[in-house]
């Protein structure tokens, strides 16, 4: 490898690491701030950390193309200001040769992004879902608020009049809709919510259970003691149905071949997400290529050192915005997936064309 290429890469890599750490940390902190309320619910620091660290793969997957562009443009602009690019250009090095060091780095980042997209991203979301269910089940008692309708699970809502010490609750109402044909309401004077084998169970005292049967008839049952087991989502992680799974929990191969049992709108969203996982990592190469193509076309001028960077950034933002607009349409109509690939191909073609052909 030529010396100037090694020099360029040695300049790009440290800045790329710094920018990745800085930008990801800022976005990550904003996500963490939204979850700080969990400390008021008694969550342990280790459980909180295990939860928030699982968000990082998603952030990296989304941010890496933009981070790579920032690092590349910053280094190349510095090299131009210091006239090192000018010296190389006057010595016969063309634009495509100047861009190669950055493109090598971009290609490496693209491969990393594909690994995140294909393996780490779905794995982290599966674990994230599991951790959320673990926290919900094990801290459920502290998360229930007085005089508020608390949605414990998808089909169970609980109202508590008053919470006492020793995990005792007074004035309990439980709305149980797990059986859609026979919804029930339970009223209890008091009770406790305990965890047995990671399963939250209400132990109720002196109350009334009302239920409608399939014919709409109301049945009532009074009780002195009643136990209601809440569905433990964490124990059902491996049994999560196709309808309950989120798109980020699927691997790419699963997204491309969704289950026939799914509704058509869910199938379309999953297939669109699969192509997003395939297309977006490519922008780790395409966006730096396009940005450098625009940047290197501008001749050096002390008065307008910022203009090449500005036009390069605007070009990248325009292509990125078009991609996400088309991706949004594709999640509703799969015909727009071809437009997503076309946008990528056009951006790459323009970038390579501008790098290869000299400015007239």
Curated annotation (Swiss-Prot):
It is a multi-pass membrane protein. The chain crosses the membrane at residues 12-32, 52-72, 96-116, 278-298, 306-326, 336-356. The keyword Lyase does not apply. Its main location: membrane. GO terms for biological process: lipopolysaccharide transport. It holds the Pfam family LptF_LptG. It comes from the Bacteria. It is found in: Cell membrane. Keywords: Cell membrane, Membrane, Transmembrane, Transmembrane helix. One of its GO terms (cellular component) is ATP-binding cassette (ABC) transporter complex. InterPro entries: LptG/LptF_permease. This is Uncharacterized protein RP871. It comes from Rickettsia prowazekii (strain Madrid E).
């Amino acid at each position: 490898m030529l010396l100037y290429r090694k020099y360029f890469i040695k300049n790009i890599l440290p800045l790329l690491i710094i920018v990745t750490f800085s930008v990801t940390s800022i976005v990550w902190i904003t996500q963490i701030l939204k979850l700080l309320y969990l400390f008021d619910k008694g969550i342990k620091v280790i459980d909180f950390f295990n939860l928030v660290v699982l968000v990082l793969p998603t952030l990296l997957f989304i941010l890496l193309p933009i981070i790579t562009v920032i690092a590349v443009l910053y280094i190349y602009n510095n090299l131009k200001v210091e006239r090192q690019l000018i010296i190389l250009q006057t010595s016969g090095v063309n634009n495509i040769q100047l861009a190669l060091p950055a493109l090598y780095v971009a290609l490496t980042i693209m491969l990393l992004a594909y690994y995140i997209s294909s393996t780490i991203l779905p794995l982290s979301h599966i674990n994230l879902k599991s951790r959320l269910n673990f926290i919900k089940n094990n801290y459920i008692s502290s998360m229930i608020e007085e005089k508020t309708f608390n949605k414990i699970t998808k089909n169970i809502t609980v109202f508590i009049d008053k919470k006492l010490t020793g995990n005792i609750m007074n004035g309990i109402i439980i709305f149980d809709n797990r059986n859609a044909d026979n919804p029930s309401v339970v009223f209890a004077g008091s009770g406790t919510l305990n965890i047995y084998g990671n399963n939250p169970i209400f132990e109720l005292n002196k109350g009334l259970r009302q239920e409608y049967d399939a014919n709409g008839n109301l049945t009532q049952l009074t009780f002195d003691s009643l136990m209601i087991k809440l569905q433990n989502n964490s124990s059902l992680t491996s049994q999560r149905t196709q309808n309950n799974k989120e798109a980020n929990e699927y691997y790419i191969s699963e997204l491309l071949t969704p289950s026939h049992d799914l509704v058509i709108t869910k199938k379309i969203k999953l297939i669109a997400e699969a192509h997003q996982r395939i297309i977006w990592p490519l922008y780790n190469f395409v966006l730096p290529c396009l940005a450098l193509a625009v940047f290197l076309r501008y001749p050096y001028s002390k008065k307008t050192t910022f203009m090449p960077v500005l036009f390069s950034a605007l070009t990248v933002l325009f292509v990125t915005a078009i991609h996400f607009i088309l991706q949004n349409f594709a999640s509703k109509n799969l015909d727009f997936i071809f437009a997503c690939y076309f946008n990528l191909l056009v951006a790459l073609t323009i970038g390579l064309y501008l790098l290869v052909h000299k400015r007239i």
